[in-house]
Amino acid sequence: MAATLGQVLALVLVAALWGGTQPLLKRASSRLQQVHERTWARQLLQEMKTLFLNPEYLMPFSLNQCGSLLYYLTLASTDLTLAVPISNSLAIIFTLIVGKVLGEDIGGKRAFAGMVLTVAGITLCITSSVTKTQGQPSAL
């Protein structure tokens, strides 16, 4: 089953939402204070309260969950052999890009080479799957 351009764009958006929010979630959760309660249930409730009342954590978490919802909806009409590589591989790329923008060390030239190779592989995957016109698969 070939994918439409809209499906591919939806999967790229999923990757952007997943990957782009990971460094923000990491940053927000590292700044939280540690909570200590006597029972595991109270500990869990206190940790959830601390997380979900923190807008710095809640905004990227909400965007990340929107990505999951979009992924679920897109899977209804997209081939898994296309959906999984696009969303998961590109999510890593978006994580590295956003991490770099936020000042994290992403690994230098080898990380950049890995990103280029990943994008090249995903491009080949998309090119072989997207239909340019109705009923005609694209030529590679």
Swiss-Prot record:
Membrane topology: Multi-pass membrane protein
Principal place of residence: membrane
Keywords tagged on the record: Membrane, Transmembrane, Transmembrane helix
InterPro entries documented for this protein: TMEM234
Any one Pfam family match given in the protein's UniProt record, by short name: TMEM234
Signal sequence coordinates: none
Localization terms from the record: Membrane
Bilayer-spanning residue ranges: 1-21, 82-102, 111-131
GO cellular component: membrane
Family recorded in the similarity comment: Belongs to the TMEM234 family.
Protein name as annotated: Transmembrane protein 234
